[in-house]
Curated annotation (Swiss-Prot):
<feature type="signal peptide">
    <location>
        <begin position="1"/>
        <end position="21"/>
    </location>
</feature>
<feature type="glycosylation site" description="N-linked (GlcNAc...) asparagine">
    <location>
        <position position="32"/>
    </location>
</feature>
<keyword id="KW-0325">Glycoprotein</keyword>
<comment type="function">
    <text>Mimics host plant CLE extracellular signal peptides that regulate cell fate. May play a role in the differentiation or division of feeding cells (syncytia) induced in plant roots during infection.</text>
</comment>
<keyword id="KW-0964">Secreted</keyword>
<keyword id="KW-0732">Signal</keyword>
<feature type="region of interest" description="Required for secretion from the host cytoplasm to the host apoplasm">
    <location>
        <begin position="21"/>
        <end position="83"/>
    </location>
</feature>
<dbReference type="GO" id="GO:0043655">
    <property type="term" value="C:host extracellular space"/>
</dbReference>
<comment type="similarity">
    <text>Belongs to the CLV3/ESR signal peptide family.</text>
</comment>
<feature type="short sequence motif" description="CLE">
    <location>
        <begin position="136"/>
        <end position="147"/>
    </location>
</feature>
<dbReference type="GO" id="GO:0005576">
    <property type="term" value="C:extracellular region"/>
</dbReference>
<dbReference type="GO" id="GO:0030154">
    <property type="term" value="P:cell differentiation"/>
</dbReference>
<dbReference type="GO" id="GO:0030430">
    <property type="term" value="C:host cell cytoplasm"/>
</dbReference>
<keyword id="KW-1035">Host cytoplasm</keyword>
<protein>
    <recommendedName>
        <fullName>CLAVATA3/ESR (CLE)-related protein 4C</fullName>
    </recommendedName>
</protein>
<keyword id="KW-0052">Apoplast</keyword>
<feature type="compositionally biased region" description="Basic and acidic residues">
    <location>
        <begin position="125"/>
        <end position="137"/>
    </location>
</feature>
Amino acid sequence: MATNTMLCLFVISVVLALAFATNKKGDEEPENHSTGIFGKVGRVVTVALAMSSRLGGADATRGGGAVYGGNLKSNQLPNNNWMAPPPPMAIRSAKVYDSKHSPAEYLKKFAQDFRRKTGMHSQRHHEETTLEQEKRVAGAGPDPIHH
């Protein structure tokens, strides 16, 4: 049944293609310069094949087409290389908020951990030392100015 339908659609598409392709230049309709005889034939054949369902003729949806048909042995390839999908990966859920710590403490801890892992330093590391920090630094001996 599907082959008869496909043959009928093919014959109709060829007849329509020949009808469109045999237009004379003296006809009243304007000529489209972008498509010649092959453009017209290709357009009609494409429409006719698209109407005859995808890849398998009229019976493709019922299982009788070229893709799903039981009588075509060339489409039935052995599936020896089939692999099962990988097992699902265990996702480590990150705790965004722990009840023991406040969000500010958690953020501070996260920043310290991030700096430790990546080797980055805080912004204070790059700042100049203040006068109080310089006074706190113990020298090698007594301060010669005051002693």
